[in-house]
């Protein structure tokens, strides 16, 4: 089983409009509300793929109850309740544009943060792989993910970590390393304080920087140009076919689902990389975020090429 961790989930509300009118009333007919957050996108895709998944994280108030109720019944859930209220994230879809209004979310009390560590430690006993995704809520220290990684390492469970900014920097500077990280070029540039291109020789050098020492897998998305990856001392380039992109949002989460599944099933490097890329591409072909149509899985899988570089 795979444990997904979403520390700052949200109720994602979608308001489709023909036109967004400013300083007046906009009436919405077709409203959708879903359990949101990067980790919950990972959860949905793993469930649709057919892997056993347990979802955890922090929820609070009536919105927290709503969120848990709106996670697929096939998914096991064991969230930790806090005093603060789970946030709303609103997307206004008008024409070809999308305007987002994102609430900051609750401030987590220090005691709640400590108690979640104990909660997380108990959940580790029943899972084989951990996937941690998204931002940290206010109130938790910037190195909180390093504490989760430390507990998972002590339990012998591999960790796929998908976060960015100061939270990722804190983990990289910690002695407790995740098994997998998946930064993109922009995030690599931010971490290193210099521009990083998609040139393969440059990426090889970058991923051997001391900052990334001790991390078994580093998987870098190159968008339509596929993926560059480092596993131990071996480098890979994944070439992907052109596809019709409907909605790319959440494709990185689907990639995390594929990586986690590959670790769970102890797949070869090539199998793990292909699965991760295919699930990301399947997500991009769907209107709904964090959703894949498995009927198209094998046809895409057969088109991907992994080469050692």
Swiss-Prot record:
One of its GO terms (cellular component) is cytosol. GO terms for molecular function: ATP binding; phosphofructokinase activity; tagatose-6-phosphate kinase activity. It holds the Pfam family PfkB. The gene is lacC. It catalyses: D-tagatofuranose 6-phosphate + ATP = D-tagatofuranose 1,6-bisphosphate + ADP + H(+). This is Tagatose-6-phosphate kinase. The keyword Transferase applies. Its EC number is 2.7.1.144.
């Amino acid at each position: 089983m795979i444990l997904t961790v979403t520390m700052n989930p949200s109720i994602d509300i979608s308001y489709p409009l023909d036109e967004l009118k400013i300083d007046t009333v906009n009436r919405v007919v077709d409203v959708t509300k879903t359990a949101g957050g990067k980790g919950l996108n990972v959860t949905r895709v793993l469930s649709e793929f057919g892997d056993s998944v347990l979802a955890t994280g922090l929820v609070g108030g009536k919105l927290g109850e709503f969120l848990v109720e709106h996670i697929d019944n096939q998914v096991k859930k064991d969230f930790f309740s806090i005093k603060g209220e789970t946030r709303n994230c609103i997307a206004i879809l008008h024409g070809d544009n999308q305007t987002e209004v994102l609430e900051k979310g609750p401030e987590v009390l220090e005691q709640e943060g400590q108690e979640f560590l104990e909660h997380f430690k108990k959940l580790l006993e029943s899972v084989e792989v951990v996937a941690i995704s998204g931002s940290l809520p206010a109130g938790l220290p910037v190195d909180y993910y390093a504490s989760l990684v430390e507990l998972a390492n002590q339990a012998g469970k591999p960790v796929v970590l998908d976060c960015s900014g100061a939270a990722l920097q804190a983990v990289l500077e910690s002695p407790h390393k995740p098994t997998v990280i998946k930064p993109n070029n922009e995030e690599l540039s931010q971490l290193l304080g210099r521009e990083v291109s998609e040139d393969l020789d440059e990426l090889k050098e970058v991923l051997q920087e001391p900052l990334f020492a001790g991390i078994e897998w580093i998987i870098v998305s190159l968008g339509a140009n596929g993926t560059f990856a480092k596993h131990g001392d071996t480098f890979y380039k994944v070439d992907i076919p052109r596809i019709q992109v409907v909605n790319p949002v959440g494709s990185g989460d689907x990639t995390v689902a594929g990586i986690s599944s590959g670790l769970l099933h102890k797949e070869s490097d090539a199998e793990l990389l292909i699965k991760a890329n295919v699930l990301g591409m399947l997500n991009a072909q769907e209107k709904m975020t964090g959703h894949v149509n498995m009927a198209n899985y094998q046809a895409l899988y057969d088109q991907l090429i992994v080469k050692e570089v």
